[in-house]
Amino acid sequence: MAETPRVLLLGDSIRMSYQPHVKLMLESKHEAVVTGPAENCQYSGYTRERLPKWLDELGRPDVVHWNNGLHDVGHNPNRSPMQFPLEAYLDNLKAVLGMLRKTGAKVIWATSTPVHPNRPFRSDAWAWKNEEIDRYNGAALELMREQHIPVNDLHAVVWSEVEACLAEDMLHLNKDGQKACADAVVEAVRKVME
């Protein structure tokens, strides 16, 4: 009997919120074993630094569904730089992609989800602008297309039902948003496993 495929999910708190749903959907039908770091993968530089440890702990994946972005594009007054430059973001994505490719896994890139258009932008707290999320998403999409990496557009999933998908903080996913993103992740994973 063939070994059950191993699916690795990488991403920030958005990933952490939909991962249990993805795990349930894929493992209940014995389609895959779903894993992901117990910690938040945060910004792209953090993922780049921690990925070897996570791969060592979690084992070689057959499929990787991955996102970095909101921690890079977000303005955080308690760090320097407050926002990671687009060039640094892309450099980190290239490095992470290179490490993932060395595992032999099929890689899926997921776009970063939007914030609610009414979420206030504050200079004294974490803050995001949708136009900046779009710019970082666009640059990442261009890179992934050049590298022939399939894309799961979670941004479009959430944006199409932004009122129904986002929690009260207008950033994180509520239960409906988690389910919508999990459905899209499962569909993308199944497609590359065909």
Q: What would you call each of these model-derived segments?
A:
Residues 89, 93, 133-137, 178:
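Aromatic/hydrophobic pocket-lining residues that form the small-molecule binding cavity
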